[in-house]
Curated annotation (Swiss-Prot):
This is E3 ubiquitin-protein ligase RNF5. It comes from the Eukaryota. The lineage of its organism: Eukaryota, Metazoa, Chordata, Craniata, Vertebrata. Residues 79-110 are annotated as: Disordered. A zinc finger (RING-type) spans 27-68. It catalyses: S-ubiquitinyl-[E2 ubiquitin-conjugating enzyme]-L-cysteine + [acceptor protein]-L-lysine = [E2 ubiquitin-conjugating enzyme]-L-cysteine + N(6)-ubiquitinyl-[acceptor protein]-L-lysine. One of its GO terms (cellular component) is endoplasmic reticulum membrane. It comes from Rattus norvegicus (Rat).
């Protein structure tokens, strides 16, 4: 017995306070002292503003937050304790709706012609071919120009007939796409 009293702080310890006169009931949603307390049919205690908000945010699934049993405005019982200043039923009044707070927009500064897309870049294209394919056809990505007759290695002469054929096919394909 003495060991049990030492574990929970003795007869005057913090765990003995729960059964005493200063005991309070806690809401099972906000875990604070229940204000305008109501008890569900399944026996769980809530603040009426907390339970009302719970029921309003889940109109299609009205269930007890603890045990998931069916719950509604009609299935809760208000608690009236000693020293209660408000003897009226808390279910009859709806808690006030909180005011919305809009934060001020951030100023990014600088010129942004198409707005700030967060690092997103848009490329216009038709089908699977964006119009940027001309940069690869005309070697715009290559920083150095080759001189006439420069050999790039075995099998890659500077003016091969494959380059001309591919350029012709690319231009033909582009105009074919425009004609459709």
């Amino acid at each position: 017995m003495a060991a049990a009293e030492e574990e929970d702080g003795g007869p005057e310890g913090p765990n003995r306070e729960r059964g005493g006169a200063s005991a309070t009931f806690e809401c099972n949603i906000c875990l604070e002292t229940a204000r305008e307390a109501v008890v569900s049919v399944c026996g769980h205690l809530y603040c009426w503003p907390c339970l009302h908000q719970w029921l309003e945010t889940r109109p299609d699934r009205q269930e007890c937050p603890v045990c998931k049993a069916g719950i509604s405005r009609e299935k809760v019982v208000p608690l009236y304790g000693r020293g209660s200043q408000k003897p009226q039923d808390p279910r009859l009044k709806t808690p006030p709706r909180p005011q919305g707070q809009r934060p001020a927009p951030e100023s990014r500064g600088g010129f942004q012609p198409f707005g700030d897309a967060g690092g997103f870049h848009f490329s216009f294209g038709v089908g699977a071919f964006p119009f940027g394919f001309f940069t690869t056809v005309f070697n715009a990505h290559e920083p150095f120009r080759r001189g006439a007759g420069v050999d790039l290695g075995q099998g890659h002469p500077a003016s091969s007939w494959q380059d001309s054929l591919f350029l012709f096919l690319a231009i033909f394909f582009f105009f074919w796409l425009l004609s459709i």
